[in-house]
Amino acid sequence: LTLELGELVSEATGQQSLSLTLTNRTEIGCFLYGYPGVSLLDSSGRLLPLNYRWSGDQMITSNKPTHVDVRPRSAAYVTINKYRCDLGNVAHATLLRVIPPDDTNRLELELPADSRSLDYCGTGDPGSDLHISPVEPTFPATLLH
């Protein structure tokens, strides 16, 4: 699997979402079931101490995980979301790590400058909760409907 940025998300006020695409680059199909492990790191490689939550919110679906078949050269989707930092950022995310469900290999993606809003706001700030969708067969399925 490879990790890439997905489609742009039409966000509610104050929300900062990032959609992700997990593409099967092999000639053999596979399946995914569950939530990916997600972590955001700063430019020094330090883990941002966000509250990483496998749950829905104002943008992310609350649906339970389903079995997702990923055919050769096809993709599965994940979206992450957090609220903005109203009182300022404590640390900036520059790297995203994803571990697909039932896997131990991590996939990494450098975050473009315009997605650096995925920052750590500080202890107790509502913007320090990062919500993670389950793996879904389509991008729209990762979002709250």
Language model region names:
Residues 1-12:
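Low-complexity, acidic Ser/Thr/Pro/Gly-rich terminal tails and inter-domain linkers that flank the onset
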Residues 32-72:
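The feature marks short-to-medium sequence segments in extracytoplasmic or secretory-pathway proteins
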Residues 12-19, 91-93:
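Short, solvent-exposed loop/turn segments enriched in Ser/Thr/Gly
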Residues 58-93:
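Short, solvent-exposed, Trp/other aromatic-anchored flexible loops in extracytoplasmic proteins
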Residues 20-27:
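Asparagine-centered strand-capping/turn motif at beta-strand->loop junctions
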